[in-house]
Amino acid sequence: MNSKIKKNNFTGELFIVSTPIGNIKDITLRAISVLAKADVVAAEDTRQALKLGNLLNFTFKKLISYNDNNASIKDNTIINLMLKGLNVCVISDAGTPLLSDPGYTLIKLAINNNIKISAIPGPSSLLSSLVVSGLPLNSFYFVGFPPKKNVLRNKLFSKISFMNSTSVWFESPKRVVSLLEDMIKVFGKIEGAFLRELTKLNEEIIRGDLSFILSNIKDREIIKGEIVIVLEPLDLSEKFEISENIKVQIQSLLQNNSLRDVVDTIVAQTGKSRNVIYKYSLSEKNKLKKL
């Protein structure tokens, strides 16, 4: 990260502005005022920003793109604009910027250069999902978009398993079914909420255990919209421990039953993690083959 940049006597301000996640009526009066007066608006997608401006009946004075692809280049450009006395707003396509969006490095640079930073609060799919999920809110962990690679995803699952906090996940419509399937394999029967298109006309909320949620969406030809999954607090340390009694039962069942039937039986009886039971059962089955 670059160090301080030489500045003039008058410094502009950086505004982090929340915008609607689906319903234009959710824009705040303060957000409208700040966006209309800003010298520069740095938007994740300028096309989406123009649509927002049209809906609000004003034209941005200056609009520039600021996203994952160009943030490292634009950070210093935006800082220099404020050091020249210009006020800059940062907006994402929807909701509160910096949550699964770029901006952290810009904030750090602004702090290093003594630039005032103001948050203009408003819509957030993270908080909106939490408050309607029906799950505990005293402690929560924001996951964002989980890794696509299995190794990294499994590490994340392991971390979440022992956290004992409600967790909030973002996922694309194309990958949400596979994510739910993976969650069920690791977490077993736990409560959750599936939220899609929040604040829009087609808003959908499905609450229940993960298998119930999956059964409601897996056969759909197309799943559209922004998706959030909220999971109940997990403290699965006990789910990952196999007692001696269970080990003996697995060994006995493997004598006359298929691996799948043994796993299904033990998981149903004990509520243990399917992955853990499967791995142990497979290990025992391989031992039997060598005898």
Regions found by a protein language model. Give the residues of each.
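A contiguous loop/helix-start segment that scaffolds small-molecule binding in enzyme catalytic cores
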Residues: 11, 87, 166, 170-291
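Short glycine-cluster motifs
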Residues: 84-147
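A short, charged helix-loop
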Residues: 14, 140-162
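General beta-strand structural signal in soluble alpha/beta enzymes
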Residues: 43, 119-122, 169, 194
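Alpha-helix capping/helix-boundary segments
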Residues: 47-49, 95-96, 125, 175, ...
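Glycine-rich, flexible N-terminal cofactor/catalytic loop recognition
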Residues: 1-67
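Conserved helicase motor
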Residues: 66-72, 146-149
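Short active-site oxyanion
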Residues: 35-41, 115-118, 166-167
